[in-house]
Amino acid sequence: MKNWKQYLPDILAVLLFAVISFAYFFPADIDGKVLYRHDSSAGRGMGLESSEYYDRTGEVTRWTGSVFCGMPTYQITPRYKSLTALTDVVDIYHLGLPENVWFLFVYLLGFYIMLRAFNFKTYLAALGSVVWAFSSYFLIIIAAGHLWKVMALAYLPPMIGGIVLAYRGKYLWGLFVTSLFTAFEIYANHVQMT
C-alpha cells in the first residue's frame, strides 16, 4: 500500500491534465463541433488518390500523381503494417481521449514526464506543464492542422526526460522512456521536428 501512495500525486496530476484538456475543449466536445483545420483538410485532399487506390485494390501505393506532378506517399498518407502495434501503444498513451483533447493532454503529460525526470516536485512539474502546454504556438498549430507537428513536439520532452533518467543512473527506465518516445517521434512522421 505504501508503494501505491507514493505515486498518488503523479496519478492525480495525470487526471488533472485530462480534466484541464477536456475543460479547454469543452464546448466543442459537448456540442460535437469540429475545428476546421486547413492543413488537415489539404492533407486529406493530397492523400485522396492513394486512399481511393487502396479502397479499390486493397494495395498500398507508394506514389501519387496528384501532388507536385508526382511524389512519394510516405509523408502524405503513410500506411505500414509495422505501425499497427505502435498505434495501439500510442492510443493507450492518449488514454482514448477525443482528438482535440488528447493533443493538449499529451503536451501536458509529456512535459510533466520530463520535469519529473529532472526531479521537479509534483506540483511544480504540473504547473510547468500547464504553462508550457498553453503557450500560444502549441494551440495555434492545433488550429492550423499541423497535427504531425503537434505529435512530434508533444513527444519530444518525454524523450529528453528518458535521456535524463539514463544520465541519472536509472538506466532501465531511461532506456524504456527514451525508446518509447523515440518510437512515438518516428510514428509522428514529421521529419523536420523529429
Task: For the regions a language model picked out, list residue spans one by one.
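Start-transfer (signal-anchor) and selected internal transmembrane alpha helices
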Residues: 1-26
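Residue-level signature of transmembrane alpha-helical entry/exit and packing/kink sites
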Residues: 6-14, 100, 104, 125, ...
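Small-residue faces within membrane-embedded alpha-helices
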Residues: 17, 129, 133, 178-179, ...
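Membrane-interface coil-to-helix junctions
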Residues: 20-114, 118, 130-157, 191
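Transmembrane-helix signature of polytopic, membrane-embedded enzymes
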Residues: 115-134, 169-175
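Membrane-embedded translocation segments of transport machinery
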Residues: 157-158, 164
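Short hydrophobic alpha-helices at membrane interfaces in multi-pass membrane enzymes
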Residues: 165-183
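Transmembrane helices and adjacent periplasmic/lumenal helix-loop junctions
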Residues: 180-194
